[in-house]
Amino acid sequence: MVVLKTSKELSDMKLSCKISAQALKLAGELIKPGVSTAYVDQMLHEFIVSQGAKPTFLGYGGFPASCCISVNDEVIHGIPSGRVIEEGDIVSVDVGAAINGYTGDNAATFAAGKVSEEAQKIMDVTKECLYRAIEAAQPGNRLGDVGYAVESYAKSFGFAVVRDYVGHGVGRKLHESPSIPDRKSVV
């Protein structure tokens, strides 16, 4: 069930999302060949804390880092390590910040230097899937319409969606309703 928020609660949520988005922007500046994923995590941790917030993922369900960093074919929730990013890698970063009792959560994929045509294509198609999902998230539509917009566009380029994960709302908790599938469903 979606819990309606007051203006003050929405303001607090916007702040947490703004900090998360700024951390994600920093990640994009840090992702380059020769940098370890642990270093990126450390820098994002320090940034979030400097804003008076707490890294949402650190300790969440036992997660040992402040952000999830997945390289190439790793599917979300990658654990930062000494792994060094290489030229041509695509690196997905998922980061969250909590402040005033509310959580923000943002993710994006970045190119480390020059990437292959295939890697660039999947990044471009994925970004367009996001835009199509946003466009489909309109009054009167169902969540399945959002998922259909994502899945049908991805499939038109020969890609598939990862069926084990969904988008989600945020608020006082990291994962709140609604769950938003990335495929056509009966929702």
PLM regions and their residue ranges:
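Active-site neighborhoods and metal-handling regions in enzymes and metal-associated proteins
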Residues: 1-187
